[in-house]
Amino acid sequence: MTEEGPGIVSLGKLRRPRMLRLWGICRVQIFSAIFMLMSPAGVGAGAKDDFSLVHPLVTMEQLLWVSGKQIGSVDTFRIPLITTTPRGTLLAFAEARKMSTSDKGAKFIALRRSMDQGSTWSPTAFIVDDGETPDGLNLGAVVSDTTTGVVFLFYSLCAHKAGCQVASTMLVWSKDDGVSWSSPRNLSLDIGTEMFAPGPGSGIQKQREPRKGRLIVCGHGTLERDGVFCLLSDDHGVSWRYGGGVSGIPYGQPKRENDFNPDECQPYELPDGSVVINARNQNNYHCHCRIILRSYDACDTLRPRDVTFDTELVDPVVAAGAVATSSGIVFFSNPAHPEFRVNLTLRWSFSNGTSWRKETVQLWPGPSGYSSLTTLEGNVDGKDEAPQLYVLYEKGRNQYMESISLVKVSVYGTL
């Protein structure tokens, strides 16, 4: 891949923000914690993935960003994304909204990195700056190529057509685990100028056939290209094209309450090689719950007959987190409430998301918004570690956009 101009933004040029007081790790039942501490050593490092070992336990929480002009004079931090690079580095991203809480307006893309499994984080770096654009950038989706080690970050410009006429899908990438980034690449010549809002969340790289190695980034459109659809790359991110999509109903027309209108979405791969896309149900069609789409050809097509509704995943119309581990555990996070963005809850499934375990972990009872998930599995720094789950989410006491917080969860419940 040829980088377009120097465009390298080095971390470390910004001073470390002052330490912030935590709002508290969510409560964990004492007897459950004691039981897990007394469990056999087999559930620690080197343990074989086994559903019977899964007892998610929060082991750490810390704030990464606080709104209110406390970091770099940024008014509001929103839209959290988190990913694990092929080398095991954690990268956390957010929209840094310069002047207001609005989805429109000028922004930075904020980044923090962790190289010690989330214990410590680099100072905030602003890796993209849209200047004073009236309808600036919007995150976004991040995906890594395990073969090349390159991390790709997608975002949109002029998504709302406010003071501008042409939407663009933009891409930056890093070859060194987020230390430096390329200049932005405009994908309009490849995919056109129909508005495509990636994610928000993570893309995936197919780990199984069909199309093993394919990069997939899913998102949603507006009236120009209605519904949920995906970007695909079969050459390690050199070129991108549109794959399958599912349109809203009525197509190309303004939607009303209870119309079918899939929106922000998160893909993950199942053990059989199929791809599930967990989507926001923008107009509460059928239920106050999640729309589930499934593709059996690596998102070349998305068929209406493969669309279902998960009534167990009650949802207040929000961007949620979803991820599948290498052993087939599916995790899901959202504000578990039919109307309000409160009660950020973690759920998990041993049946590919067709059913969910009755036990849950409440991460925050109060105002909570968008969330993003990633896992750290297998060999880390030469050690075979038990799997860890990371939840990056919007958290507040009065409003969910007051901060962005990181929770670390031990999948096997070990400290």
From Swiss-Prot:
UniProt PTM comment: N-glycosylated.
Motif FRIP motif: where in chain: 77-80
Sequence ranges of the BNR repeats: 112-123, 172-183, 231-242, 347-358
Active site residues of this protein: 103 (proton acceptor), 370 (nucleophile), 394
One of the record's GO molecular function terms: exo-alpha-sialidase activity
Keyword annotations of the record: Carbohydrate metabolism, Cell membrane, Cytoplasmic vesicle, Glycoprotein, Glycosidase, Hydrolase, Lipid degradation, Lipid metabolism, Lysosome, Membrane, Phosphoprotein, Repeat, Signal
Motif mapping: Internalization signal: 412-415
Domains (record comment): A C-terminal internalization signal (YGTL) appears to allow the targeting of plasma membrane proteins to endosomes.
Functional summary from the UniProt entry: Catalyzes the removal of sialic acid (N-acetylneuraminic acid) moieties from glycoproteins and glycolipids. To be active, it is strictly dependent on its presence in the multienzyme complex. Appears to have a preference for alpha 2-3 and alpha 2-6 sialyl linkage.
Subunit structure of this chain's protein: Interacts with cathepsin A (protective protein), beta-galactosidase and N-acetylgalactosamine-6-sulfate sulfatase in a multienzyme complex.
Name recorded for this polypeptide: Sialidase-1
Annotated organism of origin: Bos taurus
